[in-house]
């Protein structure tokens, strides 16, 4: 009887491990629709644009004995193919180029975080609002939803991957 219980427990644990490893409930890394705030220094306006960004789950691993073994590289959701679109900000004074470009994710991949194409830091407090305090209350006619993921910034300071410490 004990052998039967042991086999049953082993069967249940192996099935649970298989199901959990597939991560069926977590959306994988893919382009998703997002609303971003767009502003430019010197222009008295901040508007929102609809675009696609890369977001979602990338499988990662961590070591149990972190002090003994070296850290494993962690992958994040990155742009694979990207297109840039431009918009003209209304009301910019003469001498200020009113054209602003932003990224549109065409495809995404799980890879090491590269600062040349990805914001490797934590999420901004309010990724969908303007940075200039003059525009905080009036960045758009409709406030963007607060639940959207933080957008990645393009380009960044270097192409060095971020590894865990």
UniProtKB/Swiss-Prot annotation:
Belongs to the glycoprotein hormones subunit beta family. CDD domains: GHB_like (cd00069). Residues 1-20 form the signal peptide. High expression in the placenta throughout pregnancy. One of its GO terms (cellular component) is cytoplasm. Encoded by a cluster of genes that have evolved by duplication from LHB. HCG-beta is encoded by six non-allelic genes (CGB) clustered on chromosome 19q13.3 and named CGB1, CGB2, CGB3, CGB5, CGB7 and CGB8. Two specific hCGb proteins that differ by three amino acids in positions 2,4 and 117 have been described: type 1 (CGB7) and type 2 (CGB3, CGB5, CGB8). The CGB gene first arose in the common ancestor of the anthropoid primates. It comes from Homo sapiens (Human). This is Choriogonadotropin subunit beta 7. Transmembrane segments: none annotated. The gene is CGB7. Glycans are attached at residues 33, 50, 141, 147, 152, 158. Disulfide bonds join 29-77, 43-92, 46-130, 54-108, 58-110, 113-120. SMART domains: GHB (SM00068). Heterodimer of a common alpha chain identical in LH, FSH, TSH and HCG and a unique beta chain distinct in each of the hormones and confers receptor and biological specificity.
């Amino acid at each position: 009887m004990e052998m039967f219980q042991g086999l049953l427990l082993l069967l249940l644990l192996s099935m649970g491990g298989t199901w959990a490893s597939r991560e069926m409930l977590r959306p994988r890394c893919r382009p998703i629709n997002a609303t971003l705030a767009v502003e430019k220094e010197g222009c008295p306006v901040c508007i929102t644009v609809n675009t696609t960004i890369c977001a979602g789950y990338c499988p990662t691993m961590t070591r149990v004995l972190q002090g003994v073994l070296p850290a494993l590289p962690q992958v994040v959701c990155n742009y694979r193919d990207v297109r840039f679109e431009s918009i003209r900000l209304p009301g910019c004074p003469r001498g200020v180029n009113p054209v602003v470009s932003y990224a549109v994710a065409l495809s995404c991949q799980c890879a090491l975080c590269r600062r040349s194409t990805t914001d490797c830091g934590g999420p901004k407090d309010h990724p969908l609002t303007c940075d200039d305090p003059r525009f905080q209350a009036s960045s758009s006619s409709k406030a963007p939803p607060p639940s959207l993921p933080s957008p990645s910034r393009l380009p960044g300071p270097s192409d060095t991957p971020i590894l865990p410490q």
